[in-house]
Amino acid sequence: MVQEAQHHPIDAVITWVDGLDPAHLKKRKSVMGSAPNLFHENAINPHRWACNGELYFCLASLEHNAPWLRKIWIVVDAQSPDLSGLSAALRAKIQLVDHTEIFANYGAILPTFNSLAIETFLWNIPGLSDQFIYFNDDVFLTSPCQPSDFYTMNGSILRGTWADFSSLEDDPVQMADPVKFNHYMQINAAALCGVSSQRLFRTAHVAHPCLRPTMAQLHSRFAAAFRANAGYRMRDIRQFSPQSLHNHACILNKTATVNSVKDHFHIYSGQGVGAVDGTIAALLQNIDETPDIKMLCINDLPQLEALYPDIRGWLAQAVTGAPRSSSTE
């Protein structure tokens, strides 16, 4: 029986970047140099640094569906997102934290353009709560949530599936496939914990409830691996997923519960492209009509907008809880 959590302060952490900012673009080009072929295709896709307004929807979803959050930390690289359209109450919860702060004592690693490197030290944010929920800015809450949707007295509530990735190991064709890149990040994380690729926990594209003390303990245990992971300025096939490492450690330590209800949906990049008209509308209507859905990830909002021009209107209604069935009819 899952025990309800005694609710401690819970923060949210969101990573954000504006890749078209001239200063950021200049730094990125200096790292990539004239030989982008040295990096994995997954690492240099410009979509990784695109800013398409997702942050606003993510923040609005937290205000409407998780008002109990204590603070919302936005991790930035000498940038400031426009928060002027948000309510005063929501802005009061938000605090920007720069890469220089989370990489304290590791300054030589900067600048970095690698989300995996950044995620490696999110737990190092000064003043962060022991329980924190990590969001990519393309993840949104679409229904009211409670702390008990993320934590129990035993620890974190994880979302994902058990998977066998053993066929991917040492396969150069698969290793070069940008779609499979995330699989290798999870293989590497599981291996660090001594978990076989034949049965590892494949973390879903969701909001990730994290335990800061667990990440600190993992850092103490695997200090060299953490530093190496953070040292890649661009994504690299040798890296591990910090979320996956955290989740496998929690499973092994019995400080995690795997959610038995699929309460999330992932619209991946390329989904619906080339499909018959009405495919995306039907998909969105299915999300509308599924009461269990509490989280939504949209990997490529501009691509989805080209297929369904009213997606921003639909998403605005989805994250605020307004009736939205008519928007997909």
Regions found by a protein language model. Give the residues of each.
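Short catalytic/ligand-binding loop motif for oxyanion handling, primarily in non-cytosolic enzymes
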Residues: L20-H24, S80-G85, A104-N105, F140-P144, ...
